[in-house]
Amino acid sequence: MSEANHKNIVVVGAGIIGTSVATMLSKVSPNWHIDMFERLEGAGIESSNENNNAGTGHAALCELNYTVEQDDGSIDASKAQEINEQFELSRQFWGNLVKNGDISNPEEFIQPLPHISFVMGPTNVNFLRKRYETLKTLPMFDTIEYTEDMETMRKWMPLMMENREPGHQMAASKIDEGTDVNYGALTRKLAHYLEQKSNVSLKYNHDVVDLTQREDGKWEVVVENRETKEKVTKIADKVFIGAGGHSIPLLQKSGVKQREHLGGFPISGQFLRCTNPDIIKQHAAKVYSKEPQGKPPMTVPHLDTRYINGKQTLLFGPYANIGPKFLKFGSNLDLFESIKPYNITTMLASAVKNVPLIKYSIDQMIKTKEGCMNYLRTFIPDAKDEDWELYTAGKRVQVIKDSEQHGKGFVVFGTEVVNSDDNSMIALLGESPGASTSLSVVLEVLEKNFADDKEAWEPVVKEMVPTYGRSLINDEKLMRETRRETSKNLHLNR
């Protein structure tokens, strides 16, 4: 591989996205030096931490919001195919890191687990049936099973069917090739790999407090040691901001044009966590349902088997909780300090247009554990208060922006990548399915920020992600070969 010119690259944030970007960049060339800064005392403590998310390997197997019913009644599965392909790219990357010995023991961060969709009521049952009929014709999803039979559902989800009253129309679909992913464990493995690299400097307890672009296009990045309060300035050719909820404030400090007409609304996730081992062992799947009518996709409830530190556990949620912090370990001033003259009209327009979202968030905020338990009983009729505890998980910041298609104050559900005009800065904003599609973010960083260095990075990418540049959606043989290989590398055939 030919060497690229020397580059100084700054990566902000040591979560799953930041460590993924830094890992790939570190492999491209020894002449590329990466300074990585994390404001907390270790990697993967905020949103990537295993206790702060549901750990779904988002592959559109059970998440119903990725398949959309059209006006004519047909199902558009194009988004589901896109998400599935993106997750396959991530699996290739992780699998080859294991194969090359860069990280080890994949069973510590990924486990095979069926993904199930479960709905009630004639309208939702009709939707799920049509979704099944559509997905069954697509090679990516052709192992999907469907049932409206209660006894079959009892085999798939025994805990959910126990003492459930008959008479309600129900349906379920299942794909066995799903996964539970411990993104915290994976992030820590990537960080450990980076700590051994000679061309990477990874510093914890270091906060990026300012970013200024010089006339020559380089960036001055001011970093504060949170323990000593000492500040240093790093000069960077490229900057990647993968700081979770802190990405919007950093983007604002950078002064790039793309910060305008852009804001964020912070939401905490709360989960019920089962504390009874006898209950936990009765369920082994991720079960997603359909969001209540008129509610945003973030309201989709799910019952998740999790594998954390070698132990099986069980979560239900999420329940939203609003508050001004952009990070779990953030400041109560975060939201207010993010409102600027250049985005206040965007924020106000969003407040007017999204009354149902605000009402939902307030309703969730005042919901007691009793209210949360009542919701859980739509999934587990026999759920007992003493077997579950309510806890606050991670923060996400819903991106609000102006859009030609949707007008002012549009709320973005999903992941948003923002590039400066000269592609010297990129910031990742938003929420799910970000972690699952982390490799797609890596590829976007390379393609947009390092287009002039393609000769250096393309061979590395093709080594780590063999299907790069080819379609898994349109090439069934390649898709099946890739799945077999990644399943072997990640020890999923167990």
From Swiss-Prot:
Pfam families: Mqo
Pathway listed: Carbohydrate metabolism; tricarboxylic acid cycle; oxaloacetate from (S)-malate (quinone route): step 1/1
GO BP: any one term: tricarboxylic acid cycle
Alphabetical keyword list: FAD, Flavoprotein, Oxidoreductase, Tricarboxylic acid cycle
Keyword Oxidoreductase in record: yes
SUPFAM superfamilies documented for this protein: FAD/NAD(P)-binding domain (SSF51905)
Cofactor entry: FAD
Entry EC number(s): 1.1.5.4
Catalytic activity: (S)-malate + a quinone = a quinol + oxaloacetate
Keyword Cell wall biogenesis/degradation appears in the UniProt entry: no
GO MF annotation terms: 2-hydroxyglutarate dehydrogenase activity; L-malate dehydrogenase (quinone) activity
Family: Belongs to the MQO family.
HAMAP family: MQO
NCBIfam families (alphabetical): Lac_Quin_Ox_NO, mal_quin_oxido, PRK05257.2-1, PRK05257.3-2, PRK13339.1
Protein name: Probable malate:quinone oxidoreductase 3
Gene that specifies this protein: mqo3
